[in-house]
Amino acid sequence: LSLRRQRQMCIRDSLMGERSPHNNPDARGVFFGMSMDSTRADMTQAVLEGVAFGLRDSLEVARSLGIKIERTKICGGGAKSPLWKKIIANVMNLKVDVLEVEEGPSMGGAMLAAVGCGAYPDVETIGKKMAHVVDTVEPEPELVAKYEERYQKFRKLYPAMKDLF
């Protein structure tokens, strides 16, 4: 897999419906842009990029609400993939902090419980204590520009398909 190879394929990964930002439980996934010379590697990378594009959709909702986001955090299995970390950083044009913790949802729940029972005053305080960053991936301007163009095409797929579900 290569981030620099020009691919035309992408995926809308709504395999179990879509929740954010399109609340449509009937939405389904689709590969778009396949051709006879599409490879398994192309499809694999399209899946990784499609998930990152979906994350970007949610990021854009937050930005439209005036929320300023300069970096994001990832953990778990996907965070072990150097390729996927780079894809997320470049699609979102954000610094990506990789956390040491493997089980993010469980850790998040435990952190919220600790705040709720008064062991910590707020989420920021416990986050600084518990969410250890082990790596940071920076976006690369050349790839950010490439992915911006691809993301704009990706955004057009859902409106074009929504009446077909």
Feature-to-residue mapping (PLM):
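A short acidic, often aromatic-flanked loop/helix-cap motif at beta-alpha or helix-coil junctions
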Residues: G17-R19, R40, G104-P105, V144
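Single conserved hydrophobic/aromatic residue that forms the stacking wall/gate
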Residues: L1-C10
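Catalytic phosphate/nucleotide-handling subdomain of diverse soluble enzymes
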Residues: A46, G54-P141
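N-terminal glycine/serine-rich phosphate-binding loop of ATP-dependent small-molecule kinases
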Residues: S38, M92-V96, E149, L164-F165
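Adenine-nucleotide phosphate-binding core of ATP-dependent small-molecule kinases
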Residues: M34-L55
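Charge-patterned, long linear interaction tracts outside catalytic cores
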Residues: V144-F165
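A mobile "lid/hinge" subdomain adjacent to the ATP/sugar-phosphate binding pocket shared
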Residues: R12-T39
